[in-house]
Amino acid sequence: GCYYIAFTRIGHFILASALHLYRTLGSGEEIFLHRNEAQDILPDCSPRLIDNLKDWSEPLKRAEVELEFCRNNNIRVLCLGDDNYPKRLEDCADAPLVMYYKGNANLNQSRVINIIGTRHCTTYGADFIRRFIHDLKALCPEVLVVSGLAYGVDINAHQQALAVGYETVGVVAHGLDYLYPAAHKAVAPEMVNHGGLLTEIMTRTNADKGHHN
């Protein structure tokens, strides 16, 4: 995972170009080994990115720090192409090269449902989520419920999933060195034990609005 993480730290990193390199060469290590040939593979790529690909010293140092944090905090690094990487994402045009996962749920189980919505959930909305998940449990005993751990609909979905015994995964827009919003710290440990927390963002990264898109 070190080369994958380092690759995402290259200056002027562009995901579309990165995915093209990955799909051409097959792994983060191969991208590193063929870094001086990137312009031949991506003739229309930004000259700045091509230049930055030649020097991996700082990105590799940052990747080692990230891996050490992951090892010390039971966080798994899921790289594109790994067996445990979410298969439903692999063919997406903007599939993350690296994801960080703390939890025990199988991200590739057969039944997965995403429940997301407004941060200003009404009483009616909260009751609808409760009834929907309880009815779903009666029909499908094994479902992974995925949401964004935000206020409103998201946190209601996670809490109701846990209430009926479903595993639930929160996809967050920040590194796993902290939790946002802090008000949801109480439910996060239960999610880690019965689901998980998933992100494509490294540690020491602010929860910017752009990461939620």
Regions found by a protein language model. Give the residues of each.
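Short, positively charged patches
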Residues: 1-130, 134
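Glycine-biased, small-residue-rich flexible motifs in mid-sequence functional cores and linkers
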Residues: 79-213
